[in-house]
Amino acid sequence: MSLEILRAVLKRSYRTGRDLVVPEFYVPCFKESLSYDRAVGYFTSASLSLAARGVVHMVIRNKGKMRLVASPDLTDGDIASLRNVDANQVEIFKRIAERSMQDLVSKVEADCMSALAWMVSEGMLEIRLAYPKSGRGIFHEKIGVFRDGKNAVAFTGSINETAGGMVNNHESIDCYGSWSEPDRTNDKIQEFEDIWEGNVPGVDAIDFTKASDELFK
């Protein structure tokens, strides 16, 4: 497992309509990673479904983890799944994971909201919500970082972690690896950490479980 083996195939930029961003970028990076950090304006569990083949590989075979920071503008379905975790569905996911990765991919693709709850309940995914302290505007940062323990691939651009952003809309991202642009990659790693730890002036970041109803309005 090494992100550096992708250096010959990773492009400097990806654009929806021209490139198949999910199978050409997201999935290969997930498969070679131990962690995925993502800061976005918008997130929906549909993104897990789209990249299921890579997500499942990272969290099951690689025993990797994801950290997500997003604005509180989540779908009602995703909020409900996270707040009212269906223990039966979580157990179903656990049994499938023990049996077959391919079956698990199919399950994540078919039931992304339950997959979201399963990943959070199993510690595979941590979610924090970011918002301006002033109450004006929204958190709309877009940073992504894949890491394998030694190397990293970072990306920035217009894509949100949604079906629209990853497939349907006209969007683009710029990508760079630590082997060719270490300073730029490290900048993005630190920028994500600052957001995650709540060290960005004017922005709060709190764990999803501590979010009040008012934050989602």
Per-range role (PLM):
Residues M1-K217:
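PLD/PLD-like phosphodiesterase catalytic module centered on the HKD motif
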